[in-house]
Amino acid sequence: MAAGKVWLVGAGPGDIGLFTLKGAAVLQQADVVVYDSLVGEGVLAKIPEHARLINVGKRANHHTMVQEDINKVLLEEAEKGNKVVRLKGGDPFLFGRGGEELELLSEKGIPYEIIPGVTSPISVPAYNGIPVTHRDFCSSLHIITGHKRAGQEYDIDFKALTQTKGTLVFLMGIAALEDICKGLLAGGMDPDMPAAVLQKGTTAGQKRVVATVGTLKEEVDRQGIETPAIIVVGKVCSLADKFAWYEKLPLAGWKVLVTRPRQHISKTADLLRKKGAEVLELPSICTVPVENNSRLYEAFEKLDTYQWIIFTSPAGVEIFFDEMDRKEMDVRSLGQAKIAVIGEGTKKKLKEHHLLADFVPSVYDGDTLGAELAKELQGNEKILIPRAEAGNRKLTELLEQTGAKVDDIATYTTCYEKSRLIDEKKELETGSVDCVVFTSASTVKGFVEDTKGLDYTKVKAACIGKQTKAAADAYGMQTRMAKKATIESLIELVEEMKQEN
C-alpha cells in the first residue's frame, strides 16, 4: 500500500474568517483529522462528514494524548495510505510542537506539507486595537512562551528582554503572570510600562485588561480572566482604546447558534459574522430524496398539463431539477406552467435554473402562499407541489377549496442530525450561546432532537416566520420573529435582541 500524506495545518486563533483558504481546501480532502482543543469551533464545523476524527486534546494541564503518542498516530494513519490533516490552533510552528511531529514522519519517509496559520501573538492584539509594532513606539517584536516545565525555573533572560525596548508577547503565561511581571521588573523594566492581558481573542469571549507591568496582576485578579489568554507588554498597549474596532461591531461579544440543513452553506452565518458575532453552525437537518419517486416520474410525463408548479423550499427545487436531469429532461418540459415559490430563498434557488418565479406571497409561509395564490385561481387548474414528505397540509387544502386539482407529491424526507464535534446542549446550559437562529420549523425539530433534556424555556430563539416561531413556541422557547421572512430581516432581529439584552 502506498503511504499517505500528512498536512500540518494552522487553524488560526478562533475566528473562522482567519482560517486560510489553503487550509480549508486541504481539510475538505482529509481522510483523518487529528485536532487540538484550541481549534476554533468554526473551523471544526468545516471538517467534512467523511473524515475520521481523532481528538488529542492539549489544553493547559490536560492532554488527552501525550506528544509522543500523537507523533505515532500521525505516522500510523499515513502508513495506512490516509490523507491526514493535523489541525492545530494558531500556527503549527509557533510553540505548536510541529517540528517534533515532523521528526518521526521525516525519519520514516512519509511525505508532508506545512500550511501556516494566522498566529495569535499578532492577530489577537490586532482584534484588540494593539499594533504589535509601531515606528513611534518600538522596532522589534519578541514572542516568548510563558509556560515552564514542571519543577524547572524560567530560563528567560528578563533583563535582555527589557533592554530590547520592543513589544513582548507571552503565550501560555497566565498561570505565571505574577512571575513574569516580577521578572520584568527585576530586569529593569519601568513599572509604568503599559501591559495587557487579552482573553479569547477573535471570539465572542474576547476581553482585555490594560494596565502597567506594576499593576497588571492585581488588575487581572480584580477583573477576572479566563484562558486561553496572552500577555502583551510594551508602549503599543496604550493604543488599545484608541484603535479598538472589533468590539464596536454590532454583534461583537455575542455567540449565535445557527441551525441549517447540512447541504446548505449558511448565508445567515456569513452575515452574522460580518456583524461581529461568533457563529456556531449546527447542521440540524438533512434532506434525502425519497427512495421511490415514481409519483414524481408520473407527473413528469404530464408536466405540460399543469397550470402551476409550487415550490416550498430550496431543497424542493434542487431535488426536482436533479430528478429532471436524471430523466434527461430540461425546462422546456414545463410547458406553459407558472411557478409559485414560498419565499426569497426558494426564489433564488429557482433562478439558478434560469427560471423566474411568477408568484411570491407577501408573507413567506405556507398558509399565506395558499391563501393568496387561491385568489389567483379560476377553480379548475391542475397544480403540482413537489415537496417534503411532512409538508404543510393547509397549503393543499386552501388550493383544493377553489376547485383546483392538486398533486401533492413527497420528493424528499427530512432527517435530523447530531453534531459530531460540538456539544450544543452544553454550550447552551453553560450560557455560552446568547441566541439560537431558526430558519424553518424543521430546523427547530432538528435542534430539539440534538439537545434532548435541555431546558428550552431558557433558549432565546430568533425565528424567520410564523410557522418557525410556532414550532419553537411549542417547546417553550423565548421566541422573537423577524419582521419579514428574509435572512436580512432575521439578522436585524438578532441585532435588536442584543441591544435589548
PLM regions: where:
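Acidic, glycine-enriched active-site microenvironments
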Residues: 29, 103-104, 119, 123-126, ...
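Class I S-adenosyl-L-methionine
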Residues: 1-16, 21-118, 123, 222, ...
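Signature of uroporphyrinogen-III synthase
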Residues: 13-14, 51, 66-70, 74, ...
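Structural motif
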Residues: 5-8, 31-33, 51-54, 82-86, ...
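Short, basic, glycine/proline-bearing loop/turn elements
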Residues: 2-11, 55-60, 141-146, 280-286, ...
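Class I SAM-dependent methyltransferase SAM-binding "motif I" and its flanking Rossmann-like core
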Residues: 15, 91-164, 209, 359-365, ...
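Conserved anion/nucleotide-ligand pocket segment
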Residues: 151-196
